[in-house]
């Protein structure tokens, strides 16, 4: 993985390909490359280790021409980051780019070596190039050669193949890794993310599992896994064309932190009235399904898992329905027991997270009453394969460290919890109104919280030279502490851990000293007094405390305990609200340290491999 772009056009496509890669930089990568062929079958391949700009400079210098091409940004999975491991890979006249992991690549490599093929790279992708080259010797067309090749592959792939001897077409295959086709006028495109193509088209088609497509300037022909030609829906995208522009902000992450009030308003629009949740707006047949739910199983990864952990408290406290939350990569390999009338909920910003998708597909075989997804990308695999989808409307999120996707997931989950309790008669009209009013107030409250930016920036200097940080919370604020620790480690590279505050005495207290910052999330709720006792445990051992506390919480600071006073907000939405200062803290610590905030090392935005 990480990003794919392709084009078949009458005009030169090198600039389109490179611009597409720029738009996919947010996904994370270590190298980039293009292969372009002209009408005379002259092929140019250029690969570079490092940023897309280095590739762009090389393409400009080489004056690359040609109307058919493929391009790729790589995030290393097999083989170290290097120019020789960068895509496109070649075998004779065949060029290939690929996202995913070919699990049987070692067996295929041995087979191909026995046929006389010599491998130049350490990647699993090169086996695809050699297999296509081999199959093309006897196949009637490139399409047939690719169809024969993919039947030999085990694992996940979104792969695009170009034959220099047939510059009029490219062939793409998809299994477990997303591919979207863009339709132009006398030209067609493909990518792993529609954002790459928004500057050239607004009409898109998503390939389904097992599809193989042949793309020319005039036509897109799609074939399913059985080889039958099929039609796939073409839809107009309303995604923002300029989503890749930072505007006045220094980083995309900063921009996206500030976009949260608007993202929340958009997510709530049409789903809540002045005093109630509109259950029908949650999804097709949502009211009927929710009325029967006896158990909720949430499956997610990373930040989305933390959102699910927060919502578990809401499902049980507000709706009175038991809820389990599991990391997708663990869920799919566990021999779990499906409870009666259990609703599966997957959470994902991209809708393409490989482990979450695999968990959904497994769950469909295990007797869940329905599968729902809460997702930010319309047309993504999770949305298409779930029984119903609740879209978060956060807008395109570029920064690898998720911000607005997290808070909009929480808002969506709170609306879902309220609808569930309402359908089952477990919450009163008064309680529903209280929740809805708290949600309506939230965007304005978050706008106010963003005004603390300068204070938090000053606070961040205390963390920049530290190697470890501890985050503490209780109840639904324990997952908020988990999310805060994840953000800090992701973008500042400071080792950070989160604990339920009551667990301090069971081990983490051994870590406390004057060099260990301890961040405490302390709203005013029925666990506050317990939390104060935990704070005193740290204080008694010389720990350095930073307490984000409700104005009514009654904390008093001193030289070892700094109090960051937060305005009082509803207990119902406080978990969402307290996320904002945690995001700002992580951002400014990373800024002071000089790390790559938007593209932290070793990480990718959409994890489409296991």
UniProtKB/Swiss-Prot annotation:
Active site: 2 (nucleophile), 605 (for fru-6p isomerization activity)
GO MF assignments: carbohydrate derivative binding; glutamine-fructose-6-phosphate transaminase (isomerizing) activity
This protein's name: Glutamine--fructose-6-phosphate aminotransferase [isomerizing]
First-level EC class: transferase
Pfam families: GATase_6 (PF13522), SIS (PF01380)
UniProt-listed Gene3D superfamilies: Glucose-6-phosphate isomerase like protein, domain 1, Glutamine Phosphoribosylpyrophosphate, subunit 1, domain 1
Main location: cytoplasm
Domain spans labelled Glutamine amidotransferase type-2: 2-218
Reaction catalysis annotation: D-fructose 6-phosphate + L-glutamine = D-glucosamine 6-phosphate + L-glutamate
Oligomer status and interactors: Homodimer.
NCBIfam families for this protein: glmS, PRK00331.1
Annotated SIS domain residues: 286-426, 459-600
One GO BP: fructose 6-phosphate metabolic process
Record localization: Cytoplasm
Native species: Vibrio vulnificus (strain CMCP6)
Superkingdom to which the source organism belongs: Bacteria
GO cellular component labels: cytosol
EC assignment: 2.6.1.16
Keyword 4Fe-4S listed: no
Main function: Catalyzes the first step in hexosamine metabolism, converting fructose-6P into glucosamine-6P using glutamine as a nitrogen source.
Keywords for this protein: Aminotransferase, Cytoplasm, Glutamine amidotransferase, Repeat, Transferase
